[in-house]
Amino acid sequence: MSDQITVDELWAECEQTFEDLFLNLKKGLSRKRYMEIYTKIYNYCSSANEKALIDFYIPKVKVLVAQKAVEIMSRSESYPNDALLLFFRNQWNEWKMSSNVLKNLLSPVNKIHSSDKKTTSSSANQNESVVYSDTLNSWRETAFNPLKNKLSVSLLQIIKNDRTGFSTNLQVLSDSLECYVQLGPEKNKLEIYQSCFEQQFLQETETFYKAESADFIEKNGVCEYMRHVYNRIEQETNRVNQYMPISTLEKLTKILNNVLISNYKEQFASKFLDILIEDKSSDLVMMYSLLSRVNHLTPLKNIFSDFIKSEGLKEIESNLKEAQEKPQVLISILLKIYSRFNIMIKECYGNDTDFTTAMDKSFSILVNENPASYDPKKKESNIPVVLSKFCDQILRKGPHHISDEAELEKKLTEAVCLFKYLPDKDIFMLNYQKMLSKRLVEDLSASEDAETLMINKLKNYQGFDYCTKLTRMITDMRLCKDININFQNHLNEKSLTLPYQFNFYVLTNGSWTLTNKQTATPFKPPSEMLSSITYFESFYKKSYQGRVLTFLYDFSRADVDSRQAKGKIYKLTTTAYQMAILLMFNGADKITRFLINDTIGLDETSIRLPLLALIKTGIIECSEPSFKNWNNDTEFTVNSKFSSKKMKVSCNIAVQIGETKQSEGQQTVSEQEIEKERFFKLQAAIVRIMKSKKTMTHNDLTVETTTQVSKWFTPKITAIKKAIEYLIDQEYIRRTTDDNPSARKYEYMA
């Protein structure tokens, strides 16, 4: 091409611009001039003479860059350390700008040069600008290496000034350290930074904080020291994140943890109990945060666990009498302790599962072995009964019921939280079931929705099987409404009228803990009841063929109007037996015990409680104050002077017989009932296991049985053995006849 310029001509066009870039940057480079130079270089490289350009240009550029580096070095000698660092930073920033502009202008040359340098290597430096690389090398060899020690000392002084509270220019730190990284070889860009700065920085950091920490904790104590450490770690972390390569953070953190925390971890832990007692949540957060960095939380967990027990016991012992007598007091104390430390775990220990486990362990001991509910002689706790009574109180009508739905749900949720700590969940369930029965059949439940809510909460925690009977009880009560409506429709169709208003509960056998007591003679309902019972029995048998009704008179209730001499009418809430006794007074002013026995059919023991309760209420009177002296001729009369502030009077009250108070419906489940239920559960578990496994050794069967029933209770080995022997007698399982006793197994008999 006739218009192609030579290499010398091209250099003559570019030389002054290149010199200005490095030696007179303030002169600037216009966009127009930039494009002129770039176009000429590009056009030349597009011709056949590009190799000549490379051979000519690269050495000249290297010389120019080296000249600039020498100039910077010579000027730097006149600056002291602090001023030198600023000078170096400014020259480095200008150098970067000049190098980048030069790199872009010579990019066509670089592309050719890079293509000539290609090898089979896939390393990242294949395509690096040779021009930019040369400028970095010149800077490193001529300007950086002679000054690096002075620069590093100045940089470390900046950090020391920052640590000790003197004002300083941290941006200089960032820019200078960027230079350290940029000058590193491509294979390890951090090599120069690590060898020339980082290593010394970490050593000085360790030295600085060893001295400061020892002095500070001695003068200010642990709590102030923790706050100081917390702030120091935050400052150091922020400085690294903002001004240094992130790789330094892990190394720095290790030093800080060791010097500031590990060296004083025992002093931290020894102060933990005082902080707990003083309830300084901010200090708890700091101590947990700091000691978790050095994996020294075990002493804290142990102290925390012991503290929960001591605080709970202190609270219970200060209210011991009330806690023993009133379920709501003991449960409220336990819930208060649970809530307090559960919140502490969330807010101070980041929901740490190890602290939660420690709390569960100590709180379980507090729940089950507290002095208000634990009997050390029997080694038993009645907390399952107490918790069931607490639930009964808030779910039934009365002063303890919570009408606010949100608050009620909160209390039920808290009750289930305590429930999970019960080892004998079967005792809770048996008592809860019995109390639910009473609430439902006596119309004492405040809300069906609340009852269902509690059952669902238990179901969610313990499983569907645990609550099967409870669910069935609620279902029965719903069905009873339909049955009574249908019965009334039946009476209307037959033009029949009952002498009194009746409501019948038809309950599924097996789901309810309701059975009549065994008596020598059966109860004979009074005529006022008998016709209604007969009508309903006839209706039910026709509607539900094959079903058998058993009337539970022990649990039947009645409202009886009592008209006094002055015309005042009281509504008496009575048991069926009390109602039968009171109705006898409609025909006589006095009746003997013999007449009562003969009329209602019960023996003298069975009528004792109903009579004593009526006497205690003041409805009737007896000439013989002590029931021990009663005989067949003992007379009972209506108290014509009876009066009460309440128009509705409950006659089913507890009375003192011997050393205990009794009522017609025992509130809690007896030990015999518990043992009977457990024996049944053990049998059922063993049969299920053997039906599945077919053959098992005694030890394996014992272990598997324990596992299956453990969600209800922890069985005794003797109880399991007794259940096995019973099932052998009933021919559900049998022993093999192996000659070696240790090899004998149990076999399932289909």
UniProtKB/Swiss-Prot annotation:
- Transport as a keyword of this entry, yes or no, is no
> Is Ubl conjugation there in the keyword field?
yes
Pathway-wise, it operates in: Protein modification; protein ubiquitination
What's one Pfam family the UniProt record gives for this protein? Cullin_Nedd8
One GO biological process term: ubiquitin-dependent protein catabolic process
Q: Which domain of life is it from?
A: Eukaryota
Entry comment on modification after translation: Neddylated; which enhances the ubiquitination activity of SCF-like complex.
| Protein family (similarity comment) | Belongs to the cullin family.
Q: What does this protein do?
A: Probable core component of cullin-based SCF-like E3 ubiquitin-protein ligase complexes which mediate the ubiquitination and subsequent proteasomal degradation of target proteins. The E3 ubiquitin-protein ligase activity of the complex is dependent on the neddylation of the cullin subunit.
Spell out the protein name for this chain. Answer: Cullin-5
Q: Write down the species.
A: Dictyostelium discoideum (Social amoeba)
